UniProtKB/Swiss-Prot annotation:
Functional description taken from the UniProt entry: Binds with high affinity to muscular (alpha-1/CHRNA1) and neuronal (alpha-7/CHRNA7) nicotinic acetylcholine receptor (nAChR) and inhibits acetylcholine from binding to the receptor, thereby impairing neuromuscular and neuronal transmission.
Any one GO molecular-function label of the UniProt entry: acetylcholine receptor inhibitor activity
Listed name of the protein: Long neurotoxin 469
Signal sequence interval, chain numbering: 1-21
Disulfide cysteine pairs (residue numbers): C24-C41, C34-C62, C47-C51, C66-C77, C78-C83
Gene3D superfamilies (alphabetical): CD59
Record localization: Secreted
Tissue-specific expression: Expressed by the venom gland.
Top-level lineage group: Eukaryota
Alphabetical list of SUPFAM superfamilies matching this protein: Snake toxin-like (SSF57302)
One Gene Ontology term, aspect cellular component: extracellular region
């Protein structure tokens, strides 16, 4: 009986995955589970040489802290699952 109870507890812990696993987009429609310790999703945008033709470059990912920005970059951070979709996904 004790063995059965212990087995149920272990299975429950494994199934629940007690660690807080954040899911962020790492690319267009590409959600991934972040590594342990990375509790933020981010969206970074900037213009490159093709900005007028293609629009801003967009980088999506996971981070432990919100990335620092350079003067020409825009960075947005959030802490909920899938809170950083590609801007093209939001408009659908």
């Amino acid at each position: 009986m004790k063995t059965l109870l212990l087995t149920l507890v272990v299975v429950t812990i494994v199934c629940l995955d007690l660690g807080d696993s954040l899911i962020c987009y790492l690319g267009y429609n590409n959600p991934q589970t972040c590594a342990p310790g990375q509790n933020l999703c981010y969206t970074k945008k900037w213009c490159d040489a093709f900005c007028l033709q293609r629009g801003k470059v967009i980088q999506l990912g996971c981070a432990a802290t919100c990335p620092t920005t350079k003067p020409y970059e825009e960075v947005t951070c959030c802490s909920r699952d899938k809170c950083n979709p590609h801007p093209a996904q939001r408009s659908r």
